[in-house]
Curated annotation (Swiss-Prot):
CDD domains: NAD_bind_Glutamyl_tRNA_reduct
HAMAP family: Glu_tRNA_reductase
Catalytic activity: (S)-4-amino-5-oxopentanoate + tRNA(Glu) + NADP(+) = L-glutamyl-tRNA(Glu) + NADPH + H(+)
Protein name in the entry: Glutamyl-tRNA reductase
Recorded domain comment: Possesses an unusual extended V-shaped dimeric structure with each monomer consisting of three distinct domains arranged along a curved 'spinal' alpha-helix. The N-terminal catalytic domain specifically recognizes the glutamate moiety of the substrate. The second domain is the NADPH-binding domain, and the third C-terminal domain is responsible for dimerization.
Source organism: Coxiella burnetii (strain RSA 493 / Nine Mile phase I)
Subunit structure: Homodimer.
C-alpha cells in the first residue's frame, strides 16, 4: 500500500494561505471522518500547527487529497495547487522523520513539533483513522526521532519561536523587569514564552484566556494575574508587551482597541507579537505609529540567525534520517515478504498433510514401511517442485533471464 504526505508549510505557502488551512483540535476529528469518507482513503492522520498543515495517508494520488482540501469552505477562491507539495513512499518517510526531528521547522531542531505529531497520531488512532500502514510507520518515526535527538546536538542551545519573540522584545525594551506584559492564550507556546520571559527577568504579567480557570493555572506559579479575554481592552493601556497565541478563528485584538490604548499611553511604544494562526491581532494594527507588531513570518529573519548554531548538528541528523528512512523501507519490504513466506509455508504444509494422510492409509495395507516412506518422500518432493519447475521452464522458454538468475540465488544453486 502506498504512503503519501500532502500539505503546505511555511516554506511553500504564505501566512495568508496557511491561516485559512488550520484545523483546531476540535475540528480535526470531523475533518478526518470527512476525509475517510473519500473514495480510496482508508487511513489518514492530520497534523495542523502554526507553520504547517499536512495529511499523511495511504492513497495513490495526491489529487485525491487536494480535492478534499479544496472543498474546505475557508479556502474559497484559493488554488492550493500553487502551494501544496506531495511526497510518496521513501520520500514520504524521509519527510515525516525530518518534520518530527525539527529539521523541517522554521526554528531548526525545535522540539514542540514532535509532541504535536504524537498528539495528532493519538487522536487519529482514537477515532479509527490509523490502520496497519500508519500504525507501523509512526511508532518507527517516533523511535527514529528520539534516537536522532539523543545522538546529535540538533536540540542543543534551545531556540524556538517563543525564544525568538523574547529576543525581539528585548530589542525594544532592554529591561524586561520594568515591563508590564500581557500574554493571550494558555497553550504550549504561551507557556514557553512565559518561561523565557521570566528567565530573562520579566516579573509583571497578565494572562488572558477564554477559560479563566486555565489562565489561573498558568499564572499562579509566576504570581501573575489571570484575566478574561473580554478584559483585554481594559488592560491594553497598562502593558508594554502583548504576545498572543490562541486557536481563535476571529481576531481578539482590533486596531481600534490598540489605537485607544496608545492615546492613554501617551504614545509610549507597544511591542506586539502575534503567534497565532489564524491571526489574533488585526494586521492593520501594524500601521499605527509606536506599535511594533510582528507575526510568525516576520520572525524568520531572526530565526535564520539562530539556525547557525545548529547547522553542523543538522548535517549529522540529516544523515541519520536518510539511514533510518532506508532502514524502515527495507523492514517494510521484509514485512511484505512475510506474507509471501507464510502463504508458501502454508501451501507446502498442505501438500505434506495430504501426502501424509495417504501414507498413513498405505501403512494399513502393507507390511513394507520402507516402501511407504519412500513413496511418501517421492510424492511430496514432486508436489513441492511441480509449480516452481513449471515456472522455470516457462521462464527459460520466454528468455526471462532475470527470473532464472533469481531462482539460482533463491535456491542456492
Amino acid at each position: 500500500m502506498p504512503l503519501l504526505v500532502c500539505g503546505i508549510n511555511h516554506q511553500s505557502a504564505p501566512l495568508t494561505v496557511r491561516e485559512k488551512l488550520v484545523f483546531t483540535p476540535e475540528r480535526t476529528p470531523l475533518a478526518l471522518q470527512s476525509l475517510l469518507a473519500e473514495k480510496a482513503v482508508n487511513e489518514a492522520l492530520l497534523l495542523s500547527t502554526c507553520n504547517r498543515t499536512e495529511i499523511y495517508t495511504t492513497v495513490d494520488e495526491a489529487a485525491t487529497i487536494l480535492r478534499w482540501l479544496s472543498k474546505q469552505p475557508q479556502l474559497s477562491g484559493i488554488d492550493l495547487r500553487s502551494f501544496c507539495y506531495a511526497r510518496r513512499d521513501i520520500e514520504m518517510v524521509r519527510h515525516v522523520m525530518r518534520v518530527g526531528s525539527g529539521l523541517d521547522s522554521m526554528v531548526l531542531g525545535e522540539p514542540q513539533i514532535l509532541g504535536q505529531m504524537k498528539q495528532a497520531y493519538l487522536l487519529a488512532r482514537r477515532i479509527g483513522a490509523v490502520g496497519s500502514e500508519l500504525g507501523r510507520l509512526f511508532p518507527a518515526v517516533f523511535a527514529a526521532t528520539k534516537r536522532i535527538r539523543s545522538e546529535t546536538a540538533i536540540g542543543a542551545n534551545p531556540v524556538s519561536i517563543a525564544y525568538a519573540v523574547v529576543q525581539l522584545a528585548k530589542r525594544i525594551f532592554s529591561h524586561l523587569n520594568q515591563c508590564q506584559i500581557l500574554l493571550i492564550g494558555a497553550g504550549e507556546t504561551i507557556e514557553l514564552v512565559f518561561s523565557h520571559l521570566y528567565n530573562q527577568g520579566a516579573r509583571h504579567f497578565f494572562i488572558a484566556n477564554r477559560t479563566l480557570t486555565r489562565a489561573k493555572q498558568i499564572a499562579e506559579p509566576y504570581h501573575a494575574q489571570a484575566i478574561r479575554l473580554s478584559d483585554i481592552p481594559t488592560y491594553l493601556p497598562k502593558v508594554d508587551i502583548v504576545i498572543s497565541a490562541t486557536m481563535s478563528q476571529l481576531p481578539l485584538v482590533g486596531k481600534g482597541a490598540v489605537e485607544s490604548a496608545l492615546r492613554q499611553r501617551k504614545r509610549r511604544p507597544l511591542f506586539m507579537a502575534d503567534l497565532a494562526l489564524p491571526r489574533d491581532i488585526e494586521p492593520e494594527t501594524a500601521q499605527l505609529e509606536d506599535v511594533y507588531l510582528y507575526n510568525i513570518d516576520d520572525l524568520q529573519t531572526l530565526i535564520a540567525q539562530n539556525r547557525q548554531t545548529r547547522e553542523a548538528a543538522a548535517k549529522q541528523a540529516e544523515a541519520m534520517v536518510e539511514m533510518q528512512a532506508i532502514h524502515y523501507m527495507r523492514q517494510l519490504q521484509v514485512h511484505k515478504a512475510g506474507d509471501t513466506i507464510r502463504r508458501f509455508r502454508e501451501r507446502v504444509e498442505m501438500l505434506r498433510d495430504q501426502e501424509l494422510e495417504k501414507a498413513l492409509a498405505h501403512f494399513q495395507r502393507t507390511n513394507d514401511p520402507k516402501a511407504v516412506i519412500a513413496h511418501f518422500a517421492h510424492n511430496l518432493t514432486n508436489k513441492i517442485l511441480h509449480q516452481p519447475t513449471t515456472k522455470l521452464r516457462q521462464a527459460a522458454y520466454e528468455d526471462q533471464v532475470q527470473l532464472l538468475l533469481s531462482a539460482k540465488e533463491l535456491f542456492d544453486l
